[in-house]
């Protein structure tokens, strides 16, 4: 059998059709890129290498011992977020760490399961301006009356002596008026004690 060598142009044309290439430069482009790589692609490769040499547990810092030829112009610095410590109150000098922790515990205890927090506020009962709360009991009221009676008795005795000099009828009239006033005062005191302490009224004989 005779072997016929095909021309070079026909072989190249057929190979381009098989590879789906329309231009000779497209077929030679991968070879040129392999011999002369693009500097941008090298930067990307260096960046990938730095990511591959990150030490676990070092907060994302690269290991400069393994990678010595880094392109520092392409590397960006990202500062880590720092937690600010609890500060002291100004012009006091007292550390408020304990107070803040107590507030956090109170807020945590007053939270529901769905994340809604509640604030416990003491309920103040409305007080009417005319009705003032008093803590006067019947015993303390009696002691106050017993302290007031001796000077009243002294004044009454002096008045009785003066009236006795004027006549018996006038003395009897004044004593009757004094007894009526005393009964009226006792009835008023009994009503006030009953309203304040809700006890049975004092029976005056």
Swiss-Prot record:
Other remarks in the entry: The gene encoding this protein is included within the N gene (alternative ORF).
Summary of the function given for this chain in its UniProt record: Structural protein that is not essential for the viral replication either in tissue culture or in its natural host.
InterPro entries: Corona_nucI, N2-like_embe-CoV
Gene (name only): N
Protein name in the entry: Protein I
Entry keyword set: Virion
Keyword Ubl conjugation in record: no
Family of the protein in this entry: Belongs to the coronavirus I protein family.
Subcellular locations according to the entry: Virion
A Pfam entry, by short name: Corona_I
Cellular component, GO annotation: virion component
The organism's place on the tree of life at top rank: Viruses
């Amino acid at each position: 059998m005779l072997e016929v060598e095909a021309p070079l142009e026909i072989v190249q044309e057929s190979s381009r059709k098989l590879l789906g290439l329309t231009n000779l430069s497209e077929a030679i482009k991968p070879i040129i890129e392999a011999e002369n790589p693009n500097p941008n692609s090298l930067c990307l490769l260096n960046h990938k290498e730095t990511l591959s040499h990150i030490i676990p547990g070092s907060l994302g810092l690269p290991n400069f011992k393994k990678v010595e030829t880094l392109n520092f112009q392409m590397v960006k610095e990202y500062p880590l977020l720092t937690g600010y410590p609890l500060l002291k109150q100004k012009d006091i000098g007292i550390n408020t760490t304990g107070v803040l922790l107590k507030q956090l515990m109170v807020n945590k205890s007053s939270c529901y399961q769905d994340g809604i927090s509640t604030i416990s506020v003491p309920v103040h009962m409305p007080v009417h301006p005319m009705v003032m709360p008093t803590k006067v009991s019947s015993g303390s009221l009696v002691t106050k009356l017993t302290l007031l009676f001796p000077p009243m008795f002294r004044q009454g005795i002096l008045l009785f002596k003066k009236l006795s000099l004027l006549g018996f009828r006038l003395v009897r009239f004044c004593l009757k008026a004094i007894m009526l006033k005393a009964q009226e005062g006792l009835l008023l005191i009994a009503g006030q004690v009953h309203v304040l302490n809700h006890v049975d009224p004092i029976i005056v004989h």
